[in-house]
Amino acid sequence: MAFVGEAPADYEVIDGRPLVGPSGWRFDKLLKLADIDRAACLVTNVVDVQAPDNDIDKLLVSKADAAPGLPMVRSGKYLPLDLVPQLDRLRDEIVKCAPNVVVTMGAFAVWAFYGPAA
């Protein structure tokens, strides 16, 4: 299994891994309830940089400044060119792990796999 969040927050930046701190504690509790071994899963984020104020919208840019060829993330917001390598990293992690299930957690994670919401 692979679990894909959006971006690291304060605790994740300090620890250097996704889903630690308060959100990670809840995540671990839910995994335990479902009898899922976290160590057997890929746990990652769409991007490995922290968004200002932990607000994904603050990582995004206008269409004029967007990476060419990528769909809108949300209304009027696009991925900047400097974050495109993050999508490549995410793809490589997923390919290497070859999970039978990918759980996207958050709208940005859904976008990374499926594009903008219909």
Give residue spans per PLM region.
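A polyanion-binding, active-site-adjacent surface
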Residues: 1-118
